[in-house]
Design a protein with these regions (language model features):
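Sec-dependent bacterial lipoprotein signal peptides
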Residues: 1-14
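Hydrophobic residues positioned within well-ordered beta-strands of beta-sheet architectures
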Residues: 22, 35-38, 80, 93-95
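Post-signal-peptide N-terminal segment of Sec-exported extracytoplasmic proteins
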Residues: 37-64, 130-141
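Mature, soluble, non-transmembrane domains
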Residues: 68-183
Length: 183
């Protein structure tokens, strides 16, 4: 999935982690800087082989632990928290950042005189919920008033063939890791 602010590039660094849904909330009381909360729901590997799924799991753990913060800092983001947990039998990865400047036109976000627009870059994403307005002429673009205190949307991505094999493995590996961390 290719959503702006380079958020998903950070999470999907290995290129084989996928999620069924992504929710992004940008809290902007008073403008910049903003607080960005991204939640990826039902993470799974795009691989079917157990060893390859394990590699993707290891990448997820590195992302969770914040081992690759240099990319985030380069795009003006400061990581505040990362949470990895199981909810309703699904792996969820929630990241919270401070974003110095919301106007990132290269990543699909534009702050104009009267509105903020965000154009999703992946045609496969379906916008399933937003507090903005989806443009009828371009169903991949969402707009909000410039002074909106919160920008929020949720997208759904089609599940890939590897989902049925890798999702249960990923859930079990996360459960095991979280149990080990509690010891």
């Amino acid at each position: 999935m290719k959503i702006g602010i380079a958020l998903l590039v950070i999470l999907l660094g290995a290129g084989c982690l996928r999620s069924e849904e992504t929710e992004i909330r940008i809290l902007r009381a008073g403008g910049d800087p903003s607080v960005v909360v991204m939640e990826q729901i039902n993470l799974y590997s795009d691989e079917r082989d157990g060893a390859e799924v394990k590699k993707d799991f290891d990448q997820l753990i590195r992302d969770w632990r914040g081992e690759e913060d240099t990319v985030e800092k380069r795009v003006g983001m400061l990581a505040k928290s990362r949470e990895l947990f199981i909810r309703d039998g699904k792996v969820v990865f929630r990241q919270t950042y401070i974003l110095q400047n919301l106007d990132i036109s290269d990543d699909g976000i534009r702050v104009g005189d009267s509105q903020i627009s965000w154009t999703l870059k992946d045609d496969g994403d379906e916008i399933v919920e937003t507090n903005g307005k989806v443009l009828p002429a371009d169903p991949r673009t969402i707009v909000w008033p410039k002074d909106a205190p919160e920008l929020r949307f949720r997208t759904r991505q089609p599940l890939r063939q590897a989902f049925e094999t890798s999702q249960p493995l990923m859930v079990q590996m996360v459960k095991d890791r979280l149990a080990d961390d509690r010891k």
